[in-house]
From Swiss-Prot:
It comes from Saccharomyces cerevisiae (strain YJM789). It comes from the Eukaryota. PANTHER family: TELOMERASE CAJAL BODY PROTEIN 1. Associates with snRNPs. GO terms for biological process: mRNA processing; RNA splicing. Its main location: nucleus. This is Protein SWT21. It is found in: Nucleus. One of its GO terms (cellular component) is nucleus.
Length: 357
């Protein structure tokens, strides 16, 4: 039986003129945004990639420089068309999106057994540092232009029974809002732990451990003002909200009309500066919680302090995309230059749509 092609993630360029999609067919595709004025019609048309290349093995993790653009003429920055890709039994590698050539391989070899460690999560920050997460809650930090890690830490604690001590994700900040580093970085694990990564210290600091039936943290999203953290977990039907100053206690939850199953297509949430938090559904629609609610930690801005605490918040809107309702909308991300325009993965195809379309 032929394996279905599914989009694993989408990355917009910082100027909104192009974006990149990564798929489970080992392919990495780059798209140009059409210059048509009536982009409302684009959700009925398939987009054709401007460039594409394929690796010879599956892609476990990947990340693009936050300053990625096709039109970067500043030659003293190692940015532009670069993507870092992690796989099994292979080093983390930096590729050119234009020609698919490997530019640099990072040293991810385990010195004890001589094998390459699988990079399960990776992130590039605004200062060109590459963060990697692997087994036993190991985090390493690289300068993007150098193969050897400049900082490394591995947890000595064992995960509880049935849990995996793997760093599964790093904190994601909204595009189009922040351009500066917010200091220490959060990361999550499949053992439902949340850590703080700060290269000024010698070790990871565990800030949160949740005893829940959920199957591990898969995303950590930050509000545009940086005050609230939204945590997505596998085997869960809610998104947890925390105050960044107190990550020990759940503040509110966003209620999902479905459960994020361990073996289902990846459904990714996303926060942008204009529309708040959005997430695709198994039915091909898009759920949304508005910016005001997201920036206030799940409490609508019109609520007074005397109002009771909201504990489970349903979506404020649900948008239909005029696409096949039997195929999940796995990834949805807004264009930084035009927040009403978003790239949507629908199975293995990529579309451009307008919110509310």
């Amino acid at each position: 039986m032929e394996k279905k092609v599914i989009c694993q993630d989408i990355f917009w360029s910082c100027d909104g003129t192009s974006f990149v999609s990564v798929h489970n067919d080992f392919g990495i595709r780059q798209y140009l945004v059409p210059e048509e004025s009536n982009t409302d019609k684009l959700n009925r048309n398939l987009l054709l990639p401007f460039t594409r290349f394929f690796r010879n093995q599956s892609i476990v993790s990947c990340a693009i420089d936050p300053f990625y653009t096709l039109y970067n003429e500043n030659s003293d920055r190692l940015a532009g068309d670069r993507i870092v890709v992690g796989g099994k039994n292979f080093p983390l590698q930096l590729y050119s999106l234009m020609d698919g050539q490997c530019i640099l391989s990072y040293d991810t070899m385990n010195k004890i057994n001589g094998e390459y460690e699988t990079v399960y999560s990776v992130k590039i920050d605004v200062e060109s540092r590459v963060y990697t997460g692997s087994c036993r809650n190991k985090v390493a930090i690289y300068d993007k232009s150098r193969r050897d890690a400049v900082w490394m830490n591995q947890s000595t604690k064992k995960a509880s029974k049935g849990r995996q001590s793997i760093i599964s994700c790093f904190e994601e900040q909204p595009m189009g809002g922040q351009a500066l580093s917010r200091g220490s970085l959060l990361c999550g694990s499949y053992a439902n732990e949340m850590f703080q990564v700060d290269c000024r210290h010698q070790r990871l600091e565990r800030l949160n451990y949740t005893r829940t039936v959920a199957g591990g943290i898969v995303q950590i999203l930050t509000s545009d003002n940086g005050r609230y953290v939204y945590v997505v977990r596998r085997n869960s039907d809610a998104i947890s909200i925390y105050d960044r100053r107190n990550l020990q206690h759940e503040l509110n939850v966003l209620r999902l009309p479905f459960r994020i199953h361990h073996n289902s297509a990846k459904l990714k949430a996303y926060i942008d500066t204009a529309y708040g938090l959005s997430m695709g559904t198994p039915q091909g629609t898009i759920l949304n919680w508005g910016r005001d609610l997201v920036e206030f930690g799940g409490v609508p801005s019109h609520n007074s302090v005397e109002d009771p605490l909201i504990t489970s918040i349903p979506p404020e809107s649900e948008w239909r995309t005029n696409l096949d309702s039997t195929i999940p909308a796995t990834v949805v991300k807004n264009c930084p230059g035009d927040p009403e325009l978003f790239a949507l993965s629908h199975g293995g195809t990529i579309s451009l749509c307008r919110f509310g379309g």
